[in-house]
């Protein structure tokens, strides 16, 4: 009985210490849990923002037309024709007078070639080879202005040499002579495709 009375305070003391230790442990665990919880909230917020931003980006890209590059932006021409700028050119292997050459071009839904710039003229000179070629420049007489086969007046971008009524392209420039002489010829027609400019594709 005496032994029991002596140990009772010790037991009470040990019980109080256990409660304090338990509370301390719970506090440590609670603090660690809060840190982990905040970390989880932070990760969730970052992921949510990333998903929203990605969704907005994809939505904008879907609505925006896609521009397909066209480099170089030369005309797309049928077989046997050469594209430059927005035109297609045909360089004949046969020979004929100026009138026959123009008729041959018309049969191909084209006309004897005309040029709008020095770049176009230089392209024709490079590509034609060594032979002279009829082009679409002509006049009624030496008293009349030069006109193209589409009836537009020539702007004298390059002077013609000679005393004839029909012009041809040589390695040295533009010359003219009687239209009865047989030469090769160059036809041209506008490009009928849309690929000479960037193609807009609307996503479905």
From Swiss-Prot:
Molecular function (GO) terms for this protein are:
carbohydrate binding
Q: Which cysteines are joined by disulfide bonds?
A: 77-88, 105-187
Extracellular-side positions: 60-204
User: What is one cellular component GO term in this UniProt entry?
Assistant: plasma membrane
- Name of a matching Pfam family: Lectin_C
Domain C-type lectin, chain residue ranges per copy: 84-188
Question: Which InterPro entries does the entry link to?
Answer: C-type_lectin-like, C-type_lectin-like/link_sf, C-type_lectin/matrix_domain, CTDL_fold, NKR-like_CTLD
Cytoplasmic side of the membrane: what ranges?
1-36
Segments forming a coiled coil = none
Keyword terms, alphabetized: Cell membrane, Disulfide bond, Glycoprotein, Lectin, Membrane, Receptor, Signal-anchor, Transmembrane, Transmembrane helix
Q: What domain of life?
A: Eukaryota
What is the name listed in the Swiss-Prot or TrEMBL entry for this protein?
C-type lectin domain family 2 member E
